[in-house]
Structures are given as structure tokens and as C-alpha cells.
Amino acid sequence: MHEEFPTETPAVVTCGLPYANGDLHVGHLRTYVSGDAYARALESLGQSVAFVSGSDMHGTPIAVNAAEEGVDPESFAVEYHEQYEETFPQFNIEFDNYGHTHDETNTEMTRSFVRSWIDDDHVVEKEIEVAWDAEADQPLPDRFVEGTCPYCGEKARGDECDEGCQRHLEPGEIEAPVSTITGNPAEYRTRPHKFLRLSDFQEYLRGFIDRLEGTENAQNQPREWIEGELQDLCITRDMDWGIDYPADGDESGEDLVLYVWVDAPIEYVSSTKQYSEQVGRDEYDWEAVWKNQVDGVPPEGGEIVHIIGHDIIQHHTVFWPAMLRGAGFNEPRAVMACGFVNLDGDAFSTSRNRAVWADDYIESGLHPDLYRYHIITGSEFTADVDFSWDGLQERTNSELVGTLGNFLYRSLLFAERNYGGTPDAAVSDEVRNEIEAAMADFRTAVNDYRVRGLGRAPVELATFGNEYIQRHEPWKLTDDDPEKARQVIRDCVQIAKAIAVLAEPVLPGKAAALWDQLGEDGSVHDAELGAALESPPEAFDEPDELFEKLEDDRIEELNRQLEERIEAADAGDEEGEDEDEEPPAADLEPVADERISFGDFQDLDIRVAEVLEAEPIEGADDLAKLAVDIGVETRQIVAGIKQLHDLDSLSGTRIVVVANLEKAELFGVESNGMLLAAGEQADLLTTLEDAEPGTKVQ
């Protein structure tokens, strides 16, 4: 059990590495804004902390996109890495160090990790079946191949079931493989590869999950994966782009590079080391975070907090702790996994240009803190959050302008005009208690890993401030009871200072402006939480309004620009289709050349079923549990439709299911059959007429 923050041991906060293969949009930024806010909050508690990340320069997505543009992968990735370095600060995301996986530090650190695994016999070579494109005469690692997930039947990429059960897929597991290079069905060929023996860490991982702190989804999802027998992790790929496997004279390893999910998380360590070297180990010692061993054995956990998207929980709670343990490094203290960001109720679509790009927001002239507040407070951290210009306007005008800004401006303006600044009076017990309660809530939010609570803290205190000033009406007291008027305004100025301190993690730019308005010395970014109760300066100038109301015409223009861009992209798609004599259907897999016999088809027991009940599976992102009537009995089926259908409305729907499929267990829930659905949106197969449950599909 970890002690609460702050701790004497330094901490590190990391964010999942962005792939250096495309422009950033506001959906991507949720992880990094949240990580920045959490690191700032730790600092305000007096915690020594480094906030680090870096660009993921390797892997098949970058190799694929670089080849399409006719450039080498390194040049392609460096261009986006440099773009990210410029973009993050424009959203007040201030990394202590932002590196990349292809630099010298990470290359050597990664090889050091792998050599440790080799020396301790955690690496084994196996002959495995890998996807191969016969026409291109090359292997198809990871995203060079697509097909069907063997676990849930959804469309999947070569290394991940990204649209279904979220499982990591090993080379050779994907079914009905298709090359993304030529579009042809792939074949399988035998190749030697290196594996990390995850089975060596099975018992350790079970204990690790029990110790792990963070969000519930990161604590619960891994239990399914580690309760069964862990499969060894293939750590090499047949590619030219990446960090070479350190073969150490083993000829079979010389033409292999390391899997991207080996060197990517190791960048967390490398980036921390780079920061330590910049400031000096006397100020921040990276090994005190990652390698503070006792008698050569790492402790159960360092003060390491990973902030990621919920689609990479398995990598950070199963693979990564095993990798750390095998190399003698500390395990993470916490993993915080956030939901996705939707755009006005629907998913972002970069292919359709249906996105608000980071540059769009910057060019809009809107303050970055408005986005930070909207995305952090818009939902609980583990849930999906919606971004829209209309939603941003509503939350800004209601909460930041109407509540926070209104209290600050009316109270500080009254204080400056009537007293030249802070009135000469003591803070009342009522207000001191309210500020102390807000500080306690802030500390709790940090230690409970509730980023949303950090955003709510200053607004809730401002809500109290508005009620307090309205209740006492100091404008009436200046003549009738001047001493009481001074007391009320003194309290309000103290609340304003407390708001500046509490708001700094989520609204760093606006908090700095408020700090300056109060005439404070130094920077609010260096202030610790206790400063919320320290006396403000005696004098300050007339304040400016901290927040500007977002007018309808401004938001309408931003919406118009987005709609025009989407329409232009759609029109371009249609024009491209018209130019083809036989336009191919988008995103459809070719019909398999291999045919099955009619007898094989008859072996499938396909029936009409009626949905009796549908409910989400707790802790699973996409899975739902359905009770269905198949005529002869009621069955339970698990399907990846949680995010795609209104489960409450499915009761009574007639669907089509495969009834004689072997039973499977998904996320700890038994599934006895499979429903049939079409496309990425899982359109359910239904019947035109009212076929009774149990009717066989011929």
C-alpha cells in the first residue's frame, strides 16, 4: 500500500506516446492535458515530480504512411515529432522532457532492457507462422495485415483487435488475413522470432494487479488476461524500421527489429533520465524513481503514474510491468486510463476530415484553458467525453464566465475601488473552513486519481463565493456597517487567491493572470496548496475580466468551417468514385478464394433469436451481455456492441445468431453463441417478417 502524495520519493507522470504519423486533433489531446493537470496538482502538494513523454517513431503505421509519401520512415516521423513539440505548449501542456523513441538514449536503454531479459533466460526463440504477401514477397507485421479477431470475430489489425475485444494479437493469430499493401489474401510462412516469457511473471502480475492504483478500468480489465495462462509476447518483427534486436552473435536475430511495444514504454524511462541529466541528479534522480532497489531487488512500486487511453490498458498493466520486472526496474504505482473523445456526438474521422484539428483550435484565437476545462470536466475520466463548439460555448459561458469569472470580477473590483486592494481585516471562520474543505477535496482528487475533481474545485469554491457575497450584500454594508463590509470583501479576496491556487492545474494561463491581478510576487505555478490561505497583497490594481463570453456568431462561424470541410471531403470521395468505371466498395475485404462445401455450411446452426435483455459488462469498454430466446432455450451471448447500440431499446428485437458455436469466455463472462452483424457499426442482422425465435436460417 502506497503512502498518500506527497511522498519523499520523487515521482514521474507519463503520458502515452503519440504515434508520429499524423496531425493532432483535439481528441488526441485529452491524455496530455489530463497528464499536465495531474502533474501540476502533484507539484502543488509539494511532490517532486517530472512530467515526461515522447513521440513514438517506430512501428508499421509510420512505415506504411512513409512509404505512401515516398520518404524514409525517420524523416517522416521526425517531421511530426517536431510538430508535436510546437503544438503541446500552445495548449499549456508543459513537459519537463519530451523525447522520442529513436534517439540514442532510448535506443541504448531499450537494448539494455532486452539484454537483461536474455541474461536471465526470459527470452526464447520460436518458429512461428507469420502473414506473408506472396505478390510483394515480404512479411506482413502488425498493421501491414488486417483480418478477423480469433477471440471475438470482429475486424482487427495484425497486432490488436482495436474494434472488438481490445486484445493484443500475436503474429499468426489473425484469421482471414489480408495484405494492406496489395489487398490480396495473405498466406502464412514459418519464421524464427524472439519471445518474452510472460509466463515467468504470471504470479508476480497477479500480485501487481492487486497493488495497482489508478482508475477502475485499469485495475479491473487486466484480471481477465492474467487469470488464464499468459501467452509469451513476441518481441521482434520482420522490418527494417525500428531498433535492431541485440542479437549478441545469434545470427537468427540480426534481421529483426524490436516490436514497437517494446521500445515505446521504455521511452518513459529514457525521457525521465534525460530530464534528470538536464537538471542534475541532485535536483531530480531518475534512478530514485525507476531503480531504487534494496539488496538488488526492486521494491513493489515506484512513484510512477501512467496516464493513457483505455485502448492500451493491456500493454501498460500486463506487458509493461513484466518488462520492468524482468529488467530489475520498479513497477508503476498507478495507471489512469481515459475514455475517447467524440466530436459532436460521433467519432472523429480523420479520413473524412471530420475533426477539429489542434491547429483549428489555435487559429480560432480561443484561450487554451477553455479547451482544457471543457475536456477535463466534461465527463468522468474513464468515460467518453464529447467535444463540440456549442458545448465549449455553453460550459465556458455558464461555468467559467457566469460562475468563476463573475465572482472574481465583482469581488476584486469592489475591493480595489473601495479599499485599494485587500481590506484590513481577518478571514472569517466560515470562509477559512470553506477554503480548507476545498483544499481537502483537491488533495483527495489527486490521491483518488480523479482529474475531473481538479477542474471542479475552483468553480465550486467560486459558487460558494457568489452565494456568500450575495448573502451579505457588502454594497449595502459600506455605509450601514463598514467593518462588516471590510470583513466580507476581505473574505472574498481570500477566496479569489484560493481559486488562483486551485485553478492552476487545469487553468494555468488564467490562474497566472489572476495571480498577477492580485499583485502577488513570483509565479502561481510555483505556489503550493497552502498558499490558498496566505494573505494576499494589501494593494492591487483594478482587475480585468478574466473570461470573455463566447458569442453565438463566433461559434456559428467555427461550426460553418467544420461543416464545409466535411462536405468538401465527402464530395471529393464521391468524385473519386465517379471516376472509376467500377468503383470498389469502401473498406470491404475481398471475397476469399477458398470456398467451403455446402455440407460445411449446413454444419452451422443459424437461428432467429429474440433479445430478452441487454446490459453492459462492467469494466469492459465495448462488450455487452445479451439474454436471447432461441426457441428451445434462453442463451447468454456476449457481443462488442456496447458503444454502438442503445442496449435498452434492443429488448424484443429479432436478430440472427450462430447457435452451435463453442462456448467462450469474454471478460470473465460466458458466451454461448454469436450474433451476426455487419460493418464497423455492427448493424444487426434481422428478419424482414416476424420469424419466430428458433427458426433456422437456411
From Swiss-Prot:
<keyword id="KW-0862">Zinc</keyword>
<comment type="subunit">
    <text>Homodimer.</text>
</comment>
<dbReference type="GO" id="GO:0005524">
    <property type="term" value="F:ATP binding"/>
</dbReference>
<feature type="binding site">
    <location>
        <position position="350"/>
    </location>
    <ligand>
        <name>ATP</name>
    </ligand>
</feature>
<feature type="compositionally biased region" description="Acidic residues">
    <location>
        <begin position="570"/>
        <end position="584"/>
    </location>
</feature>
<protein>
    <recommendedName>
        <fullName>Methionine--tRNA ligase</fullName>
        <ecNumber>6.1.1.10</ecNumber>
    </recommendedName>
</protein>
<feature type="binding site">
    <location>
        <position position="149"/>
    </location>
    <ligand>
        <name>Zn(2+)</name>
    </ligand>
</feature>
<keyword id="KW-0547">Nucleotide-binding</keyword>
<dbReference type="GO" id="GO:0006431">
    <property type="term" value="P:methionyl-tRNA aminoacylation"/>
</dbReference>
<dbReference type="InterPro" id="IPR041872">
    <property type="entry name" value="Anticodon_Met"/>
</dbReference>
<dbReference type="InterPro" id="IPR002547">
    <property type="entry name" value="tRNA-bd_dom"/>
</dbReference>
<dbReference type="GO" id="GO:0046872">
    <property type="term" value="F:metal ion binding"/>
</dbReference>
<dbReference type="GO" id="GO:0004825">
    <property type="term" value="F:methionine-tRNA ligase activity"/>
</dbReference>
<dbReference type="InterPro" id="IPR023458">
    <property type="entry name" value="Met-tRNA_ligase_1"/>
</dbReference>
<dbReference type="InterPro" id="IPR004495">
    <property type="entry name" value="Met-tRNA-synth_bsu_C"/>
</dbReference>
<dbReference type="InterPro" id="IPR029038">
    <property type="entry name" value="MetRS_Zn"/>
</dbReference>
<feature type="binding site">
    <location>
        <position position="152"/>
    </location>
    <ligand>
        <name>Zn(2+)</name>
    </ligand>
</feature>
<dbReference type="GO" id="GO:0017101">
    <property type="term" value="C:aminoacyl-tRNA synthetase multienzyme complex"/>
</dbReference>
<feature type="binding site">
    <location>
        <position position="165"/>
    </location>
    <ligand>
        <name>Zn(2+)</name>
    </ligand>
</feature>
<feature type="binding site">
    <location>
        <position position="161"/>
    </location>
    <ligand>
        <name>Zn(2+)</name>
    </ligand>
</feature>
<keyword id="KW-0067">ATP-binding</keyword>
<dbReference type="InterPro" id="IPR009080">
    <property type="entry name" value="tRNAsynth_Ia_anticodon-bd"/>
</dbReference>
<feature type="short sequence motif" description="'HIGH' region">
    <location>
        <begin position="18"/>
        <end position="28"/>
    </location>
</feature>
<keyword id="KW-0479">Metal-binding</keyword>
<keyword id="KW-0820">tRNA-binding</keyword>
<comment type="similarity">
    <text>Belongs to the class-I aminoacyl-tRNA synthetase family. MetG type 1 subfamily.</text>
</comment>
<keyword id="KW-0694">RNA-binding</keyword>
<dbReference type="GO" id="GO:0005829">
    <property type="term" value="C:cytosol"/>
</dbReference>
<dbReference type="InterPro" id="IPR001412">
    <property type="entry name" value="aa-tRNA-synth_I_CS"/>
</dbReference>
<dbReference type="InterPro" id="IPR033911">
    <property type="entry name" value="MetRS_core"/>
</dbReference>
<keyword id="KW-0963">Cytoplasm</keyword>
<dbReference type="GO" id="GO:0000049">
    <property type="term" value="F:tRNA binding"/>
</dbReference>
<keyword id="KW-0436">Ligase</keyword>
<feature type="region of interest" description="Disordered">
    <location>
        <begin position="567"/>
        <end position="590"/>
    </location>
</feature>
<dbReference type="Pfam" id="PF09334">
    <property type="entry name" value="tRNA-synt_1g"/>
</dbReference>
<dbReference type="Pfam" id="PF19303">
    <property type="entry name" value="Anticodon_3"/>
</dbReference>
<comment type="function">
    <text>Is required not only for elongation of protein synthesis but also for the initiation of all mRNA translation through initiator tRNA(fMet) aminoacylation.</text>
</comment>
<dbReference type="InterPro" id="IPR015413">
    <property type="entry name" value="Methionyl/Leucyl_tRNA_Synth"/>
</dbReference>
<keyword id="KW-0030">Aminoacyl-tRNA synthetase</keyword>
<dbReference type="InterPro" id="IPR012340">
    <property type="entry name" value="NA-bd_OB-fold"/>
</dbReference>
<dbReference type="InterPro" id="IPR014729">
    <property type="entry name" value="Rossmann-like_a/b/a_fold"/>
</dbReference>
<keyword id="KW-0648">Protein biosynthesis</keyword>
